[in-house]
C-alpha cells in the first residue's frame, strides 16, 4: 500500500465525474458538511509518514479500520475521499482475510455522527469501536 496506489484508486473512482485534479492531491481548502472543521492542505501534511505509521500496526483488523478512518479524514482529494478510503481499506481487509468494511445503509446517519466527531477531535477511538461493532462483514 502506497500513496501512489491511493492516488490511482482516486483516479479510477472519479475519472468520469468531472473532478479535478484526478489522482492528485487537492490544493484548495475544502469544507465538510456538518462541521466547521477544516482539514489541512495536503502540502501541510506528510501522508507518506502517516500511512507508514498505520501500516506498522501488527493488529490486522485495527490497521484496516485505521486506514479507513485516516483516508476519510485526511481529505487528500477534492472529492471521493470516503470512497477511496473504503476501497483502499477493503483491499487490505480482503488481502488479510478480514472481510470488508461496509456501513449498513440504515446506520448511515449514526456513522456520520461518529465521523464528524472524529473529524473535529482527531480521536478515532469511538468511530473505530463503532465500525468494529457495526460495519465488519465476512469475518470467518
PLM regions: where:
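FIC/Doc superfamily catalytic core
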Residues: 1-140
Amino acid at each position: 500500500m502506497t500513496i501512489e496506489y491511493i492516488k490511482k484508486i482516486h483516479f479510477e473512482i472519479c475519472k468520469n465525474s468531472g473532478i479535478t485534479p484526478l489522482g492528485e492531491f487537492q490544493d484548495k481548502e475544502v469544507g465538510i458538511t456538518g462541521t466547521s472543521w477544516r482539514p489541512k492542505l495536503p502540502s501541510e501534511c506528510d501522508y507518506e509518514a502517516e500511512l507508514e505509521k498505520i501500516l506498522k500496526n501488527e493488529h490486522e483488523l485495527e490497521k484496516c479500520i485505521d486506514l479507513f478512518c485516516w483516508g476519510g479524514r485526511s481529505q487528500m482529494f477534492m472529492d471521493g475521499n470516503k470512497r477511496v478510503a473504503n476501497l483502499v481499506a477493503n483491499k487490505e481487509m480482503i488481502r488479510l482475510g478480514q472481510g470488508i468494511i461496509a456501513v449498513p445503509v440504515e446506520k448511515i446517519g449514526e456513522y456520520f455522527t461518529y465521523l464528524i466527531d472524529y473529524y473535529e477531535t482527531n480521536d478515532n477511538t469511538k468511530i473505530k469501536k463503532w465500525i468494529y461493532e457495526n460495519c465488519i462483514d465476512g469475518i470467518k
